[in-house]
UniProtKB/Swiss-Prot annotation:
It is found in: Cell membrane. The modification FMN phosphoryl threonine is found at T156. Belongs to the NqrB/RnfD family. The keyword Transport applies. Its cofactor is FMN. This is Na(+)-translocating ferredoxin:NAD(+) oxidoreductase complex subunit D. The chain crosses the membrane at residues 35-55, 77-99, 114-134, 182-202, 206-226, 261-281. Keywords: Cell membrane, Electron transport, Flavoprotein, FMN, Membrane, NAD, Phosphoprotein, Translocase, Transmembrane, Transmembrane helix, Transport. HAMAP family: RsxD_RnfD. Part of a membrane-bound complex that couples electron transfer with translocation of ions across the membrane. Couples electron transfer from reduced ferredoxin to NAD(+) with electrogenic movement of Na(+) out of the cell. Involved in caffeate respiration.
Length: 318
């Protein structure tokens, strides 16, 4: 009889087709359509901002890990993803140093200070965006509208919608494709490109369908209830970017099915409340960050029951 070569080791025994590097590489592939649209419409400066954020993120991670005498793990591509997502959250008018400061904050403070990859309790790119918006609101709210034939500065569709100036709104098709005019940050101008990337991630099994689907449905239903166009709310601003690439962050979102549904509903509700009743026209970033903070509580109450285990009731004291 042939001898079997068996390896004895402690659990958990994980057999997965995806490594951390392959997951991050798939996310980058999914972001390429939106990056291509940004480069086509905005020009080389959009690509330069992305490169600045990526280089700053990777360099910061390497330096911090070196200082802490930890293994340098920049080859897992997670810092690259953070850099791209941060750049996608910047307006085209942002100076280069905004990208550098945001990248350092995202990696050094939000990620490495809490233990590194998988230990951050909020999304690093969104936390950096919130930090930059609070510190330099002028640079972070200067949004350009750039038709392919001219360049003009104007308000975003969400600002127009909030002000009730619906007559000045671009067409839904323009908002969906992002090709006939630019409204918003670098990576959020084309809902179509982001949708293609998001569907790719779902197809590859990188993200669950629950969070983006429930998030978008919540926004659509809320918009219908208040008499507004649900399509406009879904394809404008950072909703598509947030739904597929931000809210689905492994470290800061629930892992249970029930938890993901509650989390996504919360993201959608807070997004619409801020958009319609808050002082800022866009609520996507803050909604996801708030639900990131609520994730441990959500998981506590939605964790799966262990089969065969029952709670023992304590006897009442006499």
């Amino acid at each position: 009889m042939n001898e079997l070569n068996l390896t004895v080791s402690s659990s958990p025994h994980i057999r997965a087709k995806h490594s951390t590097a392959s997951i991050m590489q798939n996310v980058i592939i999914a972001l390429l359509p939106a990056l291509a649209v940004a480069g086509y419409v905005f020009g080389l400066w959009a690509l330069a901002l992305v490169a600045i954020c990526v280089i700053s993120s990777v360099a910061t991670e390497a330096v911090i890990q070196k200082l802490l005498k930890k293994p340098i793990t920049v080859n897992d591509w997670s810092a690259v993803v953070t850099g791209v997502l941060l750049a996608f959250n910047l307006p085209i008018n942002a100076p280069w140093w905004i990208g550098v400061v945001g990248s350092v904050f995202a990696i050094a403070i939000v990620k490495q200070c809490f233990g590194g990859l998988g230990q951050n309790f909020i999304n690093p790119a969104l936390a950096a965006r919130a930090f930059l918006l609070a510190s330099w609101p002028g640079h972070m709210t200067s949004t350009a509208y750039i038709p392919l034939t001219d360049t003009v500065t104007t308000a975003t569709p969400l600002a127009l919608l909030k002000a009730g100036e619906t007559g000045s709104m671009p067409s839904t098709l323009d908002l969906f494709t992002g090709l006939n005019g630019v409204y918003g940050c670098i990576g959020e101008i084309s809902a179509l490109a982001l949708l293609i990337g998001g569907l790719y991630l779902i197809y590859k099994g990188i993200i669950s369908w629950r969070i983006p689907t429930i998030y978008l449905l919540t926004i659509a239903i809320f918009a219908l209830l208040v008499g507004q166009d649900p399509i406009v709310h879904m394809v404008s601003g950072g909703v598509m970017l947030g739904a597929f690439f931000m809210a689905t962050d492994y470290a800061s979102s629930p892992v249970t099915a029930k938890g993901q549904i509650i989390y996504a509903i919360g993201c959608g509700l807070i997004t619409m409340i801020i958009r319609l009743y808050g002082g800022y026209p866009e609520g996507c970033s803050y909604s996801i960050l708030l639900m990131n903070v609520a994730t441990p509580l959500i998981e506590r109450f939605t964790k799966e029951r262990i089969y065969g285990v029952t709670k023992i009731k304590k006897e009442a004291k006499a």
